[in-house]
């Protein structure tokens, strides 16, 4: 709880500073407040305590499993379920980092660095602080959830960056990020097909039959994923 309060407080301070700069008409290329938020949140996420206390997992429900997978991924399948069900790109990414180091903090730094960067990039690109500082302040909650669902939040990060690429008409980058998100976690396919609808239906009318069909397809894809 103390960790979360510290993160929220630092987030509030940095957000207030950035919004004050925006209101004063200052648009700095290097946003110091974002940098402070990035590195503090990254440090707290990477070096948080992960373990068991009285049979209860501390530091995120999935965190011990991911650490175990990272440390044993080069040794063979073993008994770790992630060797069986994890998507190929996540396995490749994990093994690539493990080849360089056995320190899981480095692994976490890369993962949470991507997640935090995607949040800040998305908010900055769409000027979400222009009228309200609440969106960035509220990011502490999904970020904390990433402690328990690492792969899910990696895919969310890639999708957010893909939306930024879409806004800037960098379509090749957008598709690359969306495809990567599916090969990190297949359930993200339901979100990755968003640009197809965007490109097609910005010039075509959406009917009730089509909307119903897409909902059914989306539910099926989500269930399969």
Tell me the role of every PLM-derived stretch.
Residues 174-177, 187-198:
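Transmembrane-embedded, aromatic-rich helix segments that form part
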Residues 159-173:
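Membrane-interface transmembrane helices that cradle and orient dolichyl/undecaprenyl
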Residues 58-68, 91, 195-225:
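Alpha-helical transmembrane segments and terminal signal-anchor/GPI-anchor hydrophobic tails
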